Amino acid sequence: MPVLTMKQLLEAGVHFGHQTRRWNPKMAEYIFTERNGIYIIDLQKTVKKMDEAYEFVKSQVAEGKIVLFVGTKKQAQETIKEEAERCGMFYINQRWLGGLLTNFRTIKTRIERLKELQRMEEDGTFEVLPKKEVNLLRKEKERLLKYLGGIQNMPRIPDILYIVDPRKERNAVLEARKLGIPIVAIVDTNCDPDEIDYVIPGNDDAIRAVKLITSKIADAVIEGREGEQFTPATTSSQEVDKASEQVEIAADDIDEE
């Protein structure tokens, strides 16, 4: 029983890839067809790859592994934060700071500074300092919170990265690969799948598509940590055939626009 059905993927627009002129040839195996200059992703491949990614995340989290959710593009920022918090994991949704993985010791010093400023605000220290100094400290705190708030309680370097758009998050991919950290990612038709350990072929630009896939990764985390059972999707062979027809219809609709 698949984690996501073809119908769910279609409704969220997961099948829409990028314009053909912006493709990466290595994604050819995940492409169903092309219509009006836009690639249509093979959702049967997405269903299979989603299942593999889900099982990997679930099994690793059950062993105590940490997942870092990464997505800094506007379409992903809110979802990355919401889903990481929902499953009790960590996230980066503003800007990837260089060395976040490869120089984590330095990043930790900035996190400690953030926590120090938070303590100062909570224990009344700000109230006895000059107003001008307090304003500067508050600005520093807000800046650190913006970029590091999602990892301020992360105890160590993550064991897994979940990424929305590895092409945009190039630095995160490079650091993870350098350290041998496995990557699970939504990979659109303009990305290089060879850099990703668990490829989920799909639209990384549509908010609904990003939300659908990311929420399932969060579900895998929760199931791995707490043993919660999420109702899996069921897809019959008839549904697969029908969904394939709908993909072709959707592709034809592009021609007509």
UniProtKB/Swiss-Prot annotation:
Classification via Pfam families: Ribosomal_S2 (PF00318)
PROSITE patterns reported in the protein's UniProt record: RIBOSOMAL_S2_1
Gene3D superfamilies for the chain: Glucose-6-phosphate isomerase like protein, domain 1, Helix hairpin bin
Ranges where the record places region Disordered: 229-257
GO CC list: cytosolic small ribosomal subunit
Family per record: Belongs to the universal ribosomal protein uS2 family.
Protein name: Small ribosomal subunit protein uS2
Native source species: Caldicellulosiruptor bescii (strain ATCC BAA-1888 / DSM 6725 / KCTC 15123 / Z-1320) (Anaerocellum thermophilum)
